[in-house]
């Protein structure tokens, strides 16, 4: 039996699931009657982790966004993982919308998590390691209490708890 148990808290999005969800969304858009004959484009930029939606009007962009979000939810990607960056005219009568995939635990949220854990006065140690928070304790029950505590924070991030040892 190990003396110390630990796990890591990070924010992550499975990019393959995002690709699969977007392919499914493209298929649905191509078969929907309200998009027949209209420009409706969905693109993923893996490098910048953005999704670009292009369509003929704001209402069609909203419909595209709803389709994409529903497909992401079916692929178990939470809606908090997506943030709308901007909407702009894309030449002619088209409108362009950029969505950002939030998949990093920034230092502000990492500090908030560690502060809440330390304020709770549990018998655990929390430390920030780059884009993740490592939590260690002698008791697995304490670690499970920390997981529940962090989930109850309702941060606008797709949190994942990995490497429970």
Curated annotation (Swiss-Prot):
Residue ranges annotated as coiled coil are none
Q: Which HAMAP family match?
A: YajQ
Q: Which protein, by its recorded name, is this?
A: Nucleotide-binding protein CFF8240_1664
Q: Which GO terms describe its cellular component?
A: cytosol
Q: Which domain of life does the protein's organism represent?
A: Bacteria
Record organism:
Campylobacter fetus subsp. fetus (strain 82-40)
What the protein does? Nucleotide-binding protein.
PANTHER family reported in the protein's UniProt record: UPF0234 PROTEIN YAJQ
Query: What does the UniProt keyword field contain?
Result: Nucleotide-binding
Q: Name one GO molecular function term.
A: nucleotide binding
Q: Which family does it belong to?
A: Belongs to the YajQ family.
The record's annotation in InterPro entries points to: DUF520 (IPR007551), UPF0234-like_C (IPR035571), UPF0234_N (IPR035570), YajQ-like_sf (IPR036183)
């Amino acid at each position: 039996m190990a003396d110390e148990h630990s796990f890591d808290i990070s924010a992550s999005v499975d990019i393959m699931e995002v690709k699969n969800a977007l392919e499914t969304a493209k298929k649905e858009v191509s078969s929907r009657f309200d998009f027949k004959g209209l420009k409706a484009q969905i693109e993923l930029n893996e490098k910048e982790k953005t999704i670009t939606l292009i369509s003929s009007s704001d209402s069609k962009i909203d419909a595209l966004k709803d389709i994409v979000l529903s497909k992401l939810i079916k692929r178990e990607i939470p809606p908090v993982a997506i943030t709308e960056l901007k909407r702009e005219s894309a030449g002619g009568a088209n409108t362009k919308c950029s969505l950002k995939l939030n998949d990093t635990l920034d230092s502000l949220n990492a500090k908030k998590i560690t502060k809440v854990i330390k304020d709770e006065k549990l018998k655990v140690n929390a430390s920030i390691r780059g884009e993740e928070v490592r939590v260690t304790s002698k008791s697995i029950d304490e670690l499970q209490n920390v997981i529940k505590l962090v989930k109850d924070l309702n941060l606008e991030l797709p949190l994942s708890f990995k490497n429970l040892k």
